[in-house]
Design a protein with these regions (language model features):
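Catalytic beta/alpha-barrel core
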Residues: 33-39, 58-65, 78-85, 101-106, ...
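Conserved N-terminal beta1-alpha1 strand-loop-helix module at the mouth
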Residues: 1-76
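Short beta-strand/loop segments at the ligand-binding rim of alpha/beta enzyme cores
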Residues: 5, 53-60, 96-102, 142-149
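Single conserved hydrophobic/aromatic residue that forms the stacking wall/gate
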Residues: 173-183
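Active-site-adjacent beta->alpha loops and helix N-cap segments on the catalytic face
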Residues: 37-51, 68, 83-96, 112, ...
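Glycine-rich beta-strand-to-loop/alpha-helix junction loops that act as flexible
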Residues: 61-62, 149-154, 170-173
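Catalytic cores of alpha/beta
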Residues: 67-75, 110-116, 155-166
Length: 183
């Protein structure tokens, strides 16, 4: 399966809307979907997505902070763990379950620690604070073909600048609209 270099983050989406939103995303080429664990009923949402889209998308959790959460996500059948930080224990537990590990990093030291711990790709977070030029400098010391994603402050107006500096992809938030919060 070839993946679009965009990862949809379904932050704050309720279980009764998660499949409808995923339908739209998948119909438009998204094939990596993350549900942050600080969303409402995240494991139930992940389970619904896994049940419907296992053959069409890589489904998993974000904001994974500890090994217990890795196991909880693994139990849903998901295959992706995204973390906001570089936690060696989380990375190693993720790889123990043969899942894809994308930990967050901010510095060259964190990036190399994540890769040495077994990470499959890196999430540069928050990207708006790092900036594409700093990312480019850090990427020069990473092993060739390291997949790097930018998250936090990435949008249609600045995505091209990141692409020009060879970012592998971006993570984009899908959040409920202000109207949805009142329903």
């Amino acid at each position: 399966m070839k993946y679009l270099p965009l990862i949809a983050i379904l932050r704050g989406i309720t279980t009764n809307k998660v499949l409808d939103i995923a339908d739209i995303l998948i119909d438009n080429g998204f094939n990596i979907i993350e549900v942050p664990l600080n969303s409402p009923n995240p494991l139930k949402s992940i389970q619904l997505l896994v049940n419907k889209y296992t053959d069409k998308a890589l489904i998993g959790a974000g904001t994974v902070l500890n090994v217990k959460e890795v196991k909880d996500v693994f139990d849903t059948g998901a295959k992706l763990i995204v973390s906001p930080n570089t936690n060696e224990d989380v990375i190693k537990e993720t790889k123990k379950f043969k899942m894809v590990s994308i930990p967050g990093c901010f510095t060259a030291s964190e990036a190399l620690l994540a890769l040495n711990s077994g990470a499959d790709a890196l999430k540069f977070f928050p990207a708006s604070s790092i900036g594409p030029k700093t990312f480019n400098a850090i990427s020069q010391i990473l092993p060739k073909n390291t997949k790097c994603f930018a998250v936090g402050g990435i949008n249609s107006s600045n995505m091209k600048e990141w692409i020009d500096f060879n970012i592998s992809g971006c993570l984009l938030y899908t959040s409920p609209s202000p109207r949805d919060k009142h329903r």
